[in-house]
């Protein structure tokens, strides 16, 4: 399991499932928040992504600083970054720019609507 801080769990669940294509995994009520995870449909027994409520002031400052500096909170590997970029743009997802070479990858960053930039990248060399 890994996590990403989100400022709205309901909006995050919608974005990560309806736009990015994850599947809901766990949804356990915890007071006013939830233990809310999603998983890749390609590996439903694989790594879960916890949509963690961003309630601590230090976490909020960290998230805001990353976003302001254009740094993705996390990055997902894709087979074809250009196709994924076009697919997501057609769904209304906003990017900071078009895919561009970055070392041994081609990468792009999108706004997850929950306070984060999320990277997508395609490995071009090993």
Question: Locations of the language-model features?
Answer:
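Short beta-strand segments
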Residues: 47-49, 118
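A short, acidic/glycine-rich surface segment
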Residues: 33-35, 57-62
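Active-site donor-binding loop signature of nucleotide-sugar glycosyltransferases
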Residues: 40, 53, 122
């Amino acid at each position: 399991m890994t996590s990403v801080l989100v400022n709205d769990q309901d909006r995050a669940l919608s974005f990560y499932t309806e736009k990015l294509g994850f599947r809901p995994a766990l949804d356990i009520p915890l007071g006013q928040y939830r233990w809310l995870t999603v998983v890749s449909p390609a590996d439903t027994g694989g790594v879960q992504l916890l949509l963690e409520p961003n309630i601590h002031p230090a976490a909020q400052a960290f998230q805001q600083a990353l976003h302001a500096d254009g740094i993705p909170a996390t990055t997902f590997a894709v087979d074809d970054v250009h196709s994924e970029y076009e697919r997501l743009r057609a769904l209304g997802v906003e990017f900071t720019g078009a895919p561009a070479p970055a070392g041994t990858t081609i990468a792009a960053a999108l706004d997850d609507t929950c306070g984060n930039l999320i990277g997508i990248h395609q490995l071009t060399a090993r």
